[in-house]
C-alpha cells in the first residue's frame, strides 16, 4: 500500500479535510448571515402617486409595525433601518417590520395640490393591501410608529383608520399642527429645509383643513377607538439634527404637553404611555432606544 503524498508534514488527505472544513464553515456562516439579516427591499406600486415606493421589510409575524420617518427621510432606505436600529430592536418579537422610504417633508398625508404626494392613500390602502396579497400579512390590527413628522402622521392615521391601526407611537411629533404657533413653524420649517409650500399640502391655514390632520383636535377618536398610544418628547429646546425636526425642536414638547392635557384631562383617556423627560434629544439617539423600549408594549397589543 502506498502512503499518501506528504508535504511539510501534512498529507494530501489532510489538506482535503482542512479545505472541506473551511468550505463547510463558510457555508454555515453565510447561511447564518442570510437568516440573521432578513431585510428585503420591496418596490410597492402606488397608483395614487404614479410610482413604486421602496419599502424595507422584515418578516416576523402576521401583524406588522409601520415605521414612518422624520422630516429628512432618505429616498431609498428608511432612516429607521440605517439610524434607528429597528430591525434589531424588533427582531424575534413576532411582528413584521414595514418601513417605507422617500417621504421627506410630506407629513405622510395626501397633498391637495401635489399628486406625487398621496401618502395617506398609500399607507392605509395600497401598501397594506399589497402586503396582504404578496406577503400574507394581516390587513387590520397593526401598529404605526413615527418620529418627528412620522409621529404626527401616526396618530392621525390611527385616528381615522382604526381598523388598520390599534397601536400608534409618536416620538417628538408635532401633535397640534393646526395651532397658530405650530402651523407657522411647520410652514416655515418645511419651506426652509424641504423647499415645499404647505399651502399645496392642506391649503391656507385659515380655511380650516389643517384641523383634519391635527391629532389633538381628534383626540376623542383615539379615546373612543381605544387605540393604544406611546408618546415621547423630551424638553430639549435645541436641535442636534435640525433637518429631522425642521429646526423647531423648541416647539415639540409644548405641543406634546397640550396633547397630553386634552387626552387625559379633557377626554379621560387612559390607554397611553407618556414620556416627556427633561433629558434626551429629538434625534435617532433617542428615537431608536424608544422603539426598543416600547417593543414589549407594542407586541402585546397587536400580536
Where in this protein do the model-derived segments appear?
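Secretory targeting and sorting signals
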Residues: 1-36
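Non-catalytic cap/lid and distal C-terminal segments of serine-dependent acyl enzymes
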Residues: 34-303
Amino acid at each position: 500500500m502506498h502512503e499518501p503524498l506528504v508535504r511539510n508534514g501534512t498529507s494530501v488527505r489532510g489538506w482535503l479535510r482542512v479545505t472541506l472544513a473551511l468550505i463547510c464553515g463558510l457555508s454555515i456562516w453565510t447561511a447564518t448571515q442570510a437568516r440573521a439579516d432578513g431585510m428585503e427591499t420591496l418596490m410597492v406600486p402606488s397608483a395614487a402617486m404614479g410610482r413604486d415606493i421602496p419599502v424595507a421589510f422584515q418578516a416576523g409575524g402576521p401583524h406588522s409595525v409601520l415605521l414612518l420617518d422624520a422630516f429628512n427621510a432618505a429616498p431609498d432606505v428608511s432612516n429607521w433601518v440605517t439610524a434607528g436600529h429597528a430591525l434589531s430592536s424588533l427582531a424575534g418579537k413576532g411582528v413584521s417590520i414595514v418601513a417605507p422610504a422617500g417621504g421627506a417633508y410630506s407629513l405622510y398625508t395626501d397633498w391637495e395640490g401635489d399628486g406625487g404626494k398621496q401618502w395617506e392613500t398609500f399607507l392605509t390602502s395600497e401598501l397594506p393591501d399589497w402586503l396582504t396579497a404578496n406577503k400574507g400579512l394581516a390587513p387590520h390590527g397593526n401598529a404605526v410608529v413615527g418620529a418627528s413628522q412620522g409621529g404626527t402622521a401616526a396618530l392621525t392615521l390611527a385616528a381615522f383608520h382604526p381598523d388598520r391601526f390599534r397601536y400608534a407611537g409618536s416620538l417628538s411629533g408635532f401633535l397640534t399642527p393646526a395651532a397658530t404657533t405650530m402651523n407657522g413653524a411647520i410652514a416655515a420649517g418645511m419651506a426652509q429645509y424641504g423647499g415645499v409650500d404647505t399651502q399645496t399640502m392642506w391649503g391656507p391655514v385659515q380655511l380650516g383643513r389643517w384641523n383634519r390632520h391635527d391629532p389633538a383636535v381628534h383626540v376623542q377618536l383615539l379615546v373612543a377607538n381605544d387605540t393604544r398610544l406611546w408618546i415621547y418628547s423630551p424638553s430639549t429646546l435645541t436641535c442636534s439634527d435640525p433637518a429631522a425636526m425642521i429646526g423647531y425642536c423648541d416647539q415639540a414638547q409644548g405641543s406634546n404637553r397640550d396633547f397630553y392635557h386634552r387626552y387625559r384631562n379633557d377626554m379621560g383617556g387612559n390607554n397611553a404611555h407618556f414620556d416627556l423627560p427633561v433629558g434626551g434629544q429629538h434625534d435617532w439617539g433617542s428615537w431608536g432606544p424608544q422603539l426598543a423600549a416600547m417593543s414589549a408594549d407594542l407586541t402585546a397589543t397587536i400580536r
